[in-house]
């Protein structure tokens, strides 16, 4: 079994706290773990203060970048977890619309949508983490 720890240069530098992407390769199968992605740019500046849709879109862009760093694609994603601060039913429509821009309707990954009180920074409204599986 081989583990690889990846902190893509295109993403914010959080390496003092966690690794952005961890891959585990075993018997020709690569499992990819994507740490929670939030609505910030490379310099950790918030994108969309108070704007749930803007933060979700940026978190998904960061998520796609993290996947690419492990030579994976959205088609490899098998599970996605979304943590939403003060979740409201209307948030599901925003999330659903944006997810459909990334994943084909017939191949959506398993998903958990979890309402939380807060995230790492008080201005974060959503965090997206995932697991992907591909051939190594």
Give names to the regions the model predicted:
Residues 1-61, 65-70, 75-78, 85-136:
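N-terminal presequence-like segments and the immediate start of the first folded domain
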